[in-house]
């Protein structure tokens, strides 16, 4: 094990001269000892002031992007010297809910406070967005990725920069951060990214079904004119020019709707955009960059599988999964953990993160937001246990674990509502009594942990030539309350399985979902289909019951099948080929 270097320079800001340049060496905390365990890294701030300036920077094609810059300051003046830089590639140089980073205390939106710790922090509006000029061609296209390269290298060569640059973000800005990595800028040394997509099709049209919460930004001129302009543009002349350019941007909802298959070509952008906008397309470049990654997700986030798959395909990554919804972090000072990561990679401080386990995840027993200490576990790989998958048959008698033959029939209702589901990026699935077929198990005699990626393996009989099939893993409390823990879904016509082009968790089937792969159902004929269910780490408490519910519609669907309403779906249970779910039950 690499020996730790302990720093004992408490209360001191030293300035060294290297090659004739002033380099600020960080002041160490009062304890004098930096290396720390998870969630314990909290150095004393070096500065209590910062300067803020806004301006435009031209990209390699001449398009001007808006930048907001925070620099460490003393007595109202920016401190001389060179500092590491972290930056955020976003939709507006000022905080915006459209960025998806959330308002949580000590979360992503507060990483600007790292100027207090001796960092220059930059917010850059992506082209076609916010105060920046240009046209948004797609959503995380290669033009935008080139901008990320240009911005990184520009930041590295400024007089207040020491050339060590990191990037961060969550949600669409997490994708932007990862696309920056894919461009391999020479000065990019670390990326801290949360709740992003590894493969855009699997994230935004998982199972061939559009049932998430967004298409990307769509704005009117008056929306952009309501923004705060950059300094010197008090009459918003430049802001109006930029806003008018934005109106030429690709209509994203139309683009996504026009690509139901993974290999579809979009005439709006002139490419097969599911591939162009997917990090998985640039997996080799990301690995070749050797940029250290810290990947963050949440068990109630729609993209939690994407972070796991990214970690499986990028050696040396750190993966953190909390009990959270999209880009939220209650119960953890995320800024401090980000600083622990950046201090190691951008400042060379021994923060202990290099020796931390590659995977840290929360195990939960409730879908409620955490209010106390989080039960954190660590692992060297995913899934973290070697217990494998346990079969739970969907019995014809409606009992989970029963091999009784029979069928469970339901009628699809596309007008069901989900009370208290939330909205926007944190919308959740919910159990709607009677909306599908439910299979409930016996009351558990002991606490039962399920950690990993479940698999649904069901035989369906439908009176249409296609269907959207959803499977929910649920917890039934002793009082009868039903909580959806996780869910999976698949368009029946896209049930064909092929070898995945990148590593997936063990046993997870891959559906290529090319246009030529579509296989219509024969109405009334039993058809088998397998699909993964979003990963989980959950303890079903003794006295609770496990339940699986299968439906043909989810209230989050934005593009339901046109003839789904009123269709009949049967779940076929037969001892020779039972419908079942496979759960990664941890063995005690």
Model-derived segments and spans:
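Secretory targeting and sorting signals
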Residues: 2-26
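N-terminal cap/lid segment of alpha/beta-hydrolase-fold proteins
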Residues: 39-81, 444-446
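Cap/lid segment of the alpha/beta-hydrolase catalytic domain
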Residues: 76-156, 477, 555
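Accessory cap/linker subdomain of secreted extracellular hydrolases
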Residues: 104-108, 116, 179-288
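Alpha/beta-hydrolase fold nucleophile elbow
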Residues: 159-171
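Glycine-rich nucleophile elbow surrounding the catalytic serine of serine-hydrolase chemistry
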Residues: 169-179
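Short beta-strand/loop motif that positions the catalytic acidic residue
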Residues: 289, 294-297
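C-terminal, loop-rich substrate-recognition/catalytic regions characterized by aromatic stacking residues
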Residues: 329-588
């Amino acid at each position: 094990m690499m020996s730790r270097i302990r720093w004992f320079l408490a209360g001191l800001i030293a300035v060294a001269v290297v090659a004739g340049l002033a380099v600020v060496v960080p002041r160490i905390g009062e304890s004098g000892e930096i290396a720390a365990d998870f969630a314990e890294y909290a150095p004393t701030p070096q500065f209590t002031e910062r300067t803020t300036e806004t301006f435009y920077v031209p990209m390699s094609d001449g398009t001007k992007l808006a930048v907001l810059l925070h620099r460490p300051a003393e007595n109202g003046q920016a401190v001389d010297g060179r500092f590491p830089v972290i930056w955020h590639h976003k939709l507006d140089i000022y905080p915006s809910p459209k960025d998806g980073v959330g308002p949580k205390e000590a979360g992503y939106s507060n990483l600007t406070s790292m100027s207090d710790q001796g960092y220059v922090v930059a917010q850059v509006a992506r082209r076609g967005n916010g105060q920046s000029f240009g046209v948004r061609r797609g959503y995380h296209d290669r033009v935008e990725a080139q901008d990320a390269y240009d911005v990184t290298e520009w930041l590295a060569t400024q007089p207040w920069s020491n050339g060590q640059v990191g990037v961060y973000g969550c949600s669409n800005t997490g994708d932007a951060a990862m696309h920056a990595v894919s461009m391999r800028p020479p000065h990019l040394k670390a990326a801290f990214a949360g709740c992003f997509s590894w493969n855009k099709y699997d994230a935004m049209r998982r199972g061939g079904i559009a049932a998430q919460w967004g298409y990307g930004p769509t704005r009117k001129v008056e929306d952009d004119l309501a923004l705060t302009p950059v300094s010197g543009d008090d009459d918003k002349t430049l802001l109006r020019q930029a806003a008018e350019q934005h109106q030429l941007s690709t209509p994203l909802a139309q683009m996504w709707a026009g690509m139901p298959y993974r290999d579809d070509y979009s005439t709006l952008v002139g490419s097969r955009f599911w591939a162009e906008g997917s990090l998985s397309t640039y997996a080799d470049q990301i690995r070749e960059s050797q940029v250290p990654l810290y990947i963050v997700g949440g068990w109630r986030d729609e993209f939690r599988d994407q972070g796991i798959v990214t970690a499986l395909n990028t050696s040396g990554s750190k993966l953190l999964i909390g009990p959270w919804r999209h880009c939220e972090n209650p119960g953890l000072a995320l800024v401090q953990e980000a600083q622990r990561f950046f201090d190691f990679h951008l400042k060379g401080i021994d923060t202990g993160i290099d020796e931390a386990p590659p995977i840290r995840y929360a195990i939960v027993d409730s879908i409620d937001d955490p209010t106390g200490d989080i039960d954190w576990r660590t692992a060297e790989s995913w899934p973290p246990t070697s217990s494998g998958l346990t079969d739970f048959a969907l019995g014809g008698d409606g009992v989970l674990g029963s091999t009784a033959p029979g069928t469970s029939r339901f009628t699809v209702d596309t007008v069901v509502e989900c009370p208290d589901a939330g909205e926007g990026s944190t919308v959740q699935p919910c159990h709607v009594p009677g909306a599908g077929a439910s299979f409930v198990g016996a009351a558990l005699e002991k606490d039962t942990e399920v950690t990993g990626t479940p698999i649904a393996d069901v035989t369906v009989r439908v009176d249409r030539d296609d269907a959207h099939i959803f499977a929910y893993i649920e917890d039934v409390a002793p009082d009868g309350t039903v909580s959806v823990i996780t869910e999976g879904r698949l368009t029946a016509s896209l049930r064909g399985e092929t070898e995945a082009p990148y590593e997936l968790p063990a046993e997870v089937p891959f559906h290529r979902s090319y246009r030529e792969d579509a296989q219509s159902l024969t109405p009334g004929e039993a058809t088998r289909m397998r699909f993964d269910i979003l990963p989980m780490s959950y303890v079903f408490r003794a006295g609770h019951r496990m339940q699986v519910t299968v439906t043909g519609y989810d209230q989050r669907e934005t593009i339901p099948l046109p003839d789904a309403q009123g269709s009949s779906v049967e779940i076929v249970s037969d001892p020779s080929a039972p419908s079942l779910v496979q759960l990664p039950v941890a063995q005690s």
